[in-house]
Regions:
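Loop/turn elements at helix/coil->beta-strand transitions in domains of secreted/extracellular proteins
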Residues: 10-17, 67-73, 106-108, 169-170
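Active-site His/acidic residue clusters
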Residues: 2-46, 82-84, 88-92
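Catalytic cores of eukaryotic secretory-pathway lumenal/extracellular enzymes that build
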Residues: 23, 45, 99, 107-108
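C-terminal cap/loop subdomain of S1 sulfatases and analogous C-terminal strand-loop tails that border
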Residues: 81-103, 118-122, 126, 131-170
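Structural recognition of the beta-strand scaffold that forms the well-ordered cores
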Residues: 15-20, 49, 72-76, 93, ...
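Solvent-exposed loop/turn segments at secondary-structure junctions
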Residues: 22-26, 54, 79-82, 101, ...
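Metal-dependent active-site segment of extracytoplasmic phospho-/sulfohydrolases and closely related
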Residues: 14, 50-87
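Non-transmembrane alpha-helical segments in soluble domains
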Residues: 2-9, 52, 56-59, 63, ...
Length: 170
């Protein structure tokens, strides 16, 4: 991913990088460099340290190539917590967990960063559905006309929610 970011430096065309990690999932196998490095000395917590380093490396590459201020960074999860995993099993204020359609199974945090555009430290309980990512990103890039018109897209442009200090989700 860092090589891709470096290649895209200086280009005027908007680009998208979808960087997925397997870390922090049910089976947690952090890189050996991170085993036992977290204060909890637990594989899940060690994996979080590894993910933090990976994200930090991507952000630093954006900074070094002069692209950070022009980049929206979105970090999230694909589901709620596992009920049966220790030490944080079902550590959630919501009903149920992964594998359920209750809020605890589908409501996850979303962290967004866009220096100069999204207010740092802002918190919201507003809803942002994963299907909103495509229309929102295209809208923010000024490319809404690229949204496919030959099929139904179950998502809406949430740009105003992200950019307005007191923006409300739709």
């Amino acid at each position: 991913s860092t090589a891709f970011i470096q290649r895209m430096a200086g280009r005027e065309q908007p680009w998208l990088l979808y960087h997925c990690t397997r870390g922090a999932h049910f089976d947690n196998y952090p890189n050996e460099r991170f085993l036992g490095k977290s204060p909890a000395k637990h594989p899940y917590k060690d994996t979080l340290l590894e993910l933090d380093e990976i994200l930090g490396r991507l952000v630093e590459t954006l900074r070094q190539t002069g692209q950070l201020e022009d980049t929206l960074i979105f970090v999230s999860s694909d589901n709620g917590p596992h009920m049966e995993t220790w030490p944080d099993s079902a550590f959630t204020p919501f009903r149920c967990a992964k594998g359920s359609t209750w809020e605890g199974g589908v409501r996850v945090p979303g962290l967004l960063m866009w220096p100069g555009m999204i207010e740092a430290g802002r918190q919201s309980d507003g809803m942002f559905y994963f299907n909103d990512v495509l229309p929102t990103v295209l809208g923010l890039a000024g490319e809404s006309e690229r949204l496919p018109g030959d099929r139904y897209i179950d998502g809406i442009d949430q740009s105003s929610f992200l950019l307005a200090p007191e923006g409300l989700s739709n």
